[in-house]
Regions:
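N-terminal, post-signal-peptide region of Sec/Tat-exported proteins
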Residues: 5-49
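Amphipathic alpha-helical segments
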Residues: 6-22, 77-81, 128-144
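Amphipathic N-proximal alpha-helical interface segments
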Residues: 48-51, 109-111, 166
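Post-signal peptide N-terminal segment of secreted/secretory-pathway proteins
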Residues: 53-56, 64, 69
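Helix N-cap motif at beta-to-alpha junctions
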Residues: 6-7, 68-72, 128-129, 185-189
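Vicinal oxygen chelate
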Residues: 2, 23-26, 66, 75-124, ...
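Eukaryotic phosphotyrosine signaling hubs
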Residues: 60-63, 177-180
Length: 231
């Protein structure tokens, strides 16, 4: 979940630059519901409509990434459309990378990785990356692998979770432009029980929300995480 002063404008901006499907809650056709999210396959980028506060940099979620074949051109388009280029282009493991910030303060990495196009990765910040990756593996699965044999991470098939080491403490994500992550469960009651057995801290126990059930936990480094059960 990201934040923006106008959810529809944010949805349009992301679709314009990164594609995806603009839609409503659960892809509803109810026109009384706002268009507040972009679907990239089964992955949703959802926007809260509020002041974005501080940006993602400096929090436990530094940025997320998209894989595209035209990194320089897309960076230029983004800068012309209210975004900001953060650093010069770099080469990493033979791939060109650019970093931008969207108009609401969330950092985005653009990488040319032909093996996985579209939504590509979540990149967290932590003083202890190995412990953070292990926590996510223990509680949310994923295959422990090195991306391109270089960066340790968790592979979820349609997205990677990567963690970089930082020396300073990181800020909690809640209230910033990248407010929280989310994971889907088929049985939230069982997930609640299993996560509690792993000493995961629940900041909101499971409850009904519209036609789904949700809960919130706090991950390492102040990362807020939503748990969702859908029919």
């Amino acid at each position: 979940h990201l934040t923006a002063t106008n959810a529809q404008e944010a949805v349009n901006w992301y679709v314009k630059h990164f594609g995806g499907e603009a839609t409503r809650f659960l892809r509803s056709t109810d026109t009384e519901l706002p268009i507040d999210r972009v679907m990239y396959g089964d992955i949703a980028v959802i926007f809260f409509e509020r002041d974005p506060g501080e940006g993602s940099v400096g929090s436990g979620v530094d940025h997320f990434g998209f894989s595209v074949g035209n990194v320089p051109e897309l960076v230029a388009d983004i800068v012309a459309d209210g975004g900001t280029q953060l650093v010069d282009f770099v080469e990493f493991s033979g791939r060109q990378i650019g970093f931008v910030e969207d108009p609401w303060g969330t950092k985005i990495e653009l990488i040319n990785d032909p093996e996985l196009r579209g939504m590509h990765h979540l990149h967290l910040s932590s003083p202890d990356p190995q412990a953070t990756l292990q926590w996510y593996a223990d509680n949310f699965g994923g295959e422990s692998e090195r991306w391109k044999d270089v960066l340790p991470g968790l592979n979820y098939g349609d997205i990677w979770l990567l963690v970089s080491q930082v020396q300073q403490a990181v800020a909690p994500t809640q209230g910033r432009s990248f407010d929280h992550l989310g994971w889907k469960f088929s049985d939230l009651t069982a997930a609640h029980r299993n996560l509690q057995a792993n000493d995961v801290e629940f900041t909101m126990d499971p409850r009904d929300f519209r036609s789904i059930r949700i809960a919130f936990v706090e991950g390492p480094d102040g990362v807020r995480i939503e748990l969702v059960e859908k029919d």
